């Protein structure tokens, strides 16, 4: 029984190591949309999902629809928005929202900010070898501004 459980865990770990995944650890819906695909024939199949609370979406790094570079270390730009009132956009550098970059086999976690801050949500990005790319504070998700307002 323990061997079967261990084998299942190894299988799960191996499969997620070959994909980038976006985890929504918030209590709100989150939209994740890949930037325009360089191959217009694949653009309609790019990653474009709305994730419910506590859910995830993954893309195997060799799938060219959602990882145009096709490698574990390819960089993919994603638009990350948190739905609700007020809406939030996540990105770095400040003012570049909603742009978040992930490697082809990395992970993005959208979660409540564990620190006391004006920004209630942050994004954590890790590479395939679990290196944290976002520093101790993470990437802040700021309140979205309506077009035409300052």
Label every model-predicted segment:
Residues 2-13:
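Sec-dependent N-terminal signal peptides
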């Amino acid at each position: 029984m323990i061997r079967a459980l261990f084998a299942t865990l190894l299988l799960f770990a191996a499969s997620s190591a070959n994909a980038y995944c976006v985890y929504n650890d918030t209590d709100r819906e989150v939209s994740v949309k890949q930037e325009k695909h360089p191959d217009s024939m694949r653009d309609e199949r790019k990653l474009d999902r709305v994730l419910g609370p506590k859910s995830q979406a993954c893309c195997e790094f060799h799938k060219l629809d959602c990882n145009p570079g096709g490698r574990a270390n390819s960089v993919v730009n994603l638009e990350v928005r948190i739905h609700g009132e007020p809406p939030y956009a996540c990105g770095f550098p400040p003012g570049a929202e909603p742009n978040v970059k992930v490697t082809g086999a990395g992970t993005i976690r959208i979660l409540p900010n564990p620190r006391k801050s004006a920004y209630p949500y942050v994004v954590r990005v890790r590479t395939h070898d679990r290196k944290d790319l976002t520093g101790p504070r993470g990437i802040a998700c700021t309140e979205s501004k309506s077009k035409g307002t300052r």
